[in-house]
Regions:
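Flexible glycine-rich surface loops and low-complexity tracts that mediate binding to linear polymers
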Residues: 4, 9, 84-105
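A general sequence property marking short-to-moderate contiguous segments
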Residues: 5-42
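Structural detector for short beta-strands of small beta-barrel domains
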Residues: 27-60, 89-94
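Acidic, low-complexity, intrinsically disordered interaction modules
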Residues: 57, 61-72
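Non-Sec secretion/translocation targeting segments of pathogen effectors
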Residues: 65-66, 104-114
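Beta-strand/loop nucleic-acid-binding surfaces
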Residues: 68-86
Length: 114
């Protein structure tokens, strides 16, 4: 089943595709998730040998979805001792098959300001 996350106007809408139409499954507050369309069905399975830094987009009973760069990664919900907060910028690591999420360190960015 194709599933996507639509974030706009402060709302987070979980949709699934049925016969070419997108139907709403759940509508809730977006919180800290940035506006956009996130195709959850295109998510790749998380590499358990790497540390993955990014924003937690969505969590359901089976999976936790995280945006890493421009890609979406899917973690198994059962691997987490405690599921991370939606919208939080988290660093997910695996140790002995269990996933641990902690707040990712802020990256310093050099920019111009006036």
């Amino acid at each position: 089943m194709k599933q996507r996350l639509l974030v706009m106007n402060g709302q987070k809408i979980v949709q699934h595709e049925q016969e070419g139409l997108w139907l709403n499954d759940k509508v809730e507050k977006a919180g800290l998730v940035k506006p956009g369309i996130y195709n959850l069905y295109l998510a790749s399975q998380a590499d358990k040998t790497k540390t993955l830094d990014g924003v937690i987009l969505h969590a359901d009973k089976d999976s936790v979805f995280q945006q890493v760069g421009k890609n979406v990664v899917k973690h198994d919900r059962a691997d987490f001792v405690k599921a991370p907060a939606i919208g939080s910028h988290s660093s997910v690591t695996y140790d002995q098959g269990k996933a641990f999420a902690r707040a990712a360190p802020e990256k310093l960015v050099r920019g111009m300001s006036r």
